[in-house]
Amino acid sequence: MNDQAQLLPGTLDLLILRAVSLGPLHGYGILLRIGQISGNALLIEQGALYHGLFRLVRQGLLKASWGTSENNRRAKFYSLTAAGRKRLREETDSWNRLATAIASALSQQPEEA
């Protein structure tokens, strides 16, 4: 059995926003940051990541600008916009409520038949 968790639909954007909220990053840095903040339980495929980044920039939740990476290569860096910070807060609150509800439901003991 694979120890890495499968992403639930709708979580990729939230994870990208969270990773970038800790500071501007290029795409590969975002992949590494998501792995780091999830204890390496979540690994995102590059294709999915770049589709997500494009979508978030188009929605005005991320801003992209060119810069130089730590290995002196030209890279596109992503940072949160004000709208991105707002969305991150809203989605985090929503996921926390959902996680609490699911944990509560799973902790209930089944009735004896």
Show which residues each predicted segment covers.
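Intrinsically disordered, low-complexity serine/threonine- and proline-rich regulatory segments
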Residues: 1-7, 91
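N-terminal helix-turn-helix DNA-binding core of bacterial DNA-binding proteins
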Residues: 5-48
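A cross-family signal for key residues in well-ordered alpha-helices
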Residues: 18, 32, 51, 89, ...
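Basic amphipathic alpha-helical segments that dock to polyanions
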Residues: 49-56
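Beta-hairpin "wing" of winged helix-turn-helix
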Residues: 57-74, 79
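Accessory beta->alpha helical hairpin/"wing" motif in late/C-terminal subdomains of nucleic-acid enzymes
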Residues: 80-84
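Amphipathic alpha-helical dimerization/coiled-coil segments
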Residues: 86-113
